[in-house]
Amino acid sequence: MAENNSKLSFTNARLLAVQTIYAHMMGDEDWNKLMSRGLLGELGGKALTEENGSEKYVALPAADAGLYTRVVDAYRENAEDIDNAIRTSLTEKISFDRLDPTFLCILRAGMAEFYADSETAAPIIINEYVDLTRSFYEGSEIKIANAMLDRFSKVIRG
C-alpha cells in the first residue's frame, strides 16, 4: 500500500508540475510564487470526475515535493532548450504556436524531468506523461507525446 501511495505522490507531482508550467504560461505569474502555491496545495490537488451523471472534484493524494520542485526547476533552467527540442520534433503539419497549451505543458514537464532525474528509467517517465496526456486527450496527442518523449530521452540520456 505504501508503494502505491508513493507512486501516486510521484504521479501527482508530475501533474502539479504541468499545472504550474501551464499557470506560468497563461498568467506569467512569478515562478517562485507559483511553486509556493503548488507546495502549499493552493494549486492543483483536485481532479474532476463524473459520478451518476454529475461532475465533482475529488482530492488527490499529496504530490511528492522533491520531484515537483526538481521538474519545475529543470524546466525553468532549460526552457529554451526544451522548447527548441519540441519545435524541431514537430512535423510541417503541426507548428509550435498551434499546439494546445495543456499538451505543450505536458511535453515541457516530461522533457524537463529527463534533466531533473537521471535515476528514474526513461520508460517510466515516458509512460507517466503519456498517461497524463491520455487523461486530457483521446487523439493523436497520445502517440505524439510518446514519440517526442522517447526521442528526447535518447538525446538527453544517450
Residue ranges and their predicted role:
Residues M1-G158:
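N-terminal interaction/assembly modules
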